Amino acid sequence: KTNTGGEGSKHGIWHEAIPDVLQRAEWAGLAVSGLHMHIGSGADLNHLATVADSLERTARDIGRSLTMISAGGGLPVPYQEGEHRADMSEYFKLWDTTRKRLEDSFGHRIRLEIEPGRYLTAEAGILVTEVRAMKRQGSKKYLLVDAGFHTLARPVLYGSYHPMSLCPTSTTPPHELEAVAIGGPLCE
């Protein structure tokens, strides 16, 4: 499973290593000009406020050489009923307020970058696949389709939910609804 953040991730620099990184940058004659934080793609503004405070504290540790802050990790996309869209105006206001406080503190302009991630494209397409076979294996019924994780990797990589709809090919009334497993042509 892909791990894009936290202590065990291959990405970025864990916050406890920042003092060492700053010391190395100074030794090499480099000024740290940007700070990027991978925040995850949650819509919980209370959590984001905590993350913004953490970014601001780290920015102050870096100091006046900083000219850019970046909130990465993407914006949330609702896939299931009950999930909410991000309140974009509140999301921006939170990060812009952080940026302005840093500008006031440092006395120069701070650029704000926001990484939208899959937010821009997640709802831009539809995968259409065809049920090629039905099969019972023990107590489970499988619908075998002509698309697999090579076509739609997110559920396999992240264990994420992906909505599906069935489009009947006949006008015959459907049978009772039942839970089925969907399988593709690969050994997923």
Which residues does each predicted region cover?
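Active-site-proximal beta-alpha core segment in soluble small-molecule metabolic enzymes
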Residues: 1-70, 77, 94, 98-103, ...
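Generic alpha-helical secondary structure signal
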Residues: 15, 83, 95, 162-165
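Short glycine/threonine-rich loop-to-helix capping motif typified by GTGT followed
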Residues: 44-51, 79-91, 121-133
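Active-site beta-loop-alpha junctions enriched in small/polar residues
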Residues: 37-42, 69-76, 80-82, 117-119, ...
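A broadly tuned preference for mixed-charge, low-complexity surface segments
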Residues: 33-47, 84-90, 166-176, 180
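Broad hydrophobic/π-residue packing in well-ordered secondary structure
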Residues: 7, 11, 47-49, 68, ...
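Charged (often Lys/Glu-rich) extended helix/loop segments that serve as interaction or gating elements
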Residues: 109-188
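Nucleotide-activated donor-binding/catalytic signature segment of Leloir-type glycosyltransferases, i.e.
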Residues: 106
